[in-house]
Structure formats: C-alpha cells, structure tokens
C-alpha cells in the first residue's frame, strides 16, 4: 500500500508542476496535437 501512496504523490506532484508550467507559459506546440 505504501508503494501506491508514494507513486500517487509522485505523479500528482509532477502533474501539478507540469500544469503550472503549462498554464504559465503558452505551449508552442499546436493544441490539436495535445488533444
């Protein structure tokens, strides 16, 4: 169970950082490729 908790925290932290950078700086890649 601890492995799942640590994995969840790691993924959530990376996700928050990714979205923070994503919304802070507009991506140069076309939005169609992301969807």
Swiss-Prot record:
Cellular-component GO terms for this entry: chloroplast thylakoid membrane; photosystem II reaction center
Predominant cellular place of this UniProt entry's protein: plastid
Subcellular location: Plastid, Chloroplast thylakoid membrane
Top-level taxon: Eukaryota
Membrane topology: Single-pass membrane protein
InterPro entries: PSII_PsbT, PSII_PsbT_sf
Keywords: Chloroplast, Membrane, Photosynthesis, Photosystem II, Plastid, Thylakoid, Transmembrane, Transmembrane helix
Transmembrane annotation, as ranges: 3-23
GO biological process: photosynthesis
The family this protein is said to belong to: Belongs to the PsbT family.
PANTHER family cross-referenced by the UniProt entry: PHOTOSYSTEM II REACTION CENTER PROTEIN T (PTHR36411:SF2), PTHR36411
Function as written in the Swiss-Prot or TrEMBL entry: Found at the monomer-monomer interface of the photosystem II (PS II) dimer, plays a role in assembly and dimerization of PSII. PSII is a light-driven water plastoquinone oxidoreductase, using light energy to abstract electrons from H(2)O, generating a proton gradient subsequently used for ATP formation.
Subunit structure: PSII is composed of 1 copy each of membrane proteins PsbA, PsbB, PsbC, PsbD, PsbE, PsbF, PsbH, PsbI, PsbJ, PsbK, PsbL, PsbM, PsbT, PsbY, PsbZ, Psb30/Ycf12, at least 3 peripheral proteins of the oxygen-evolving complex and a large number of cofactors. It forms dimeric complexes.
Name assigned to this protein: Photosystem II reaction center protein T
Species annotation: Bassia hyssopifolia
Gene: psbT
């Amino acid at each position: 169970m601890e492995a799942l908790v640590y994995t969840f925290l790691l993924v959530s932290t990376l996700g928050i950082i990714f979205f923070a950078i994503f919304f802070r700086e507009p991506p140069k890649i076309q939005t169609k490729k992301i969807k």
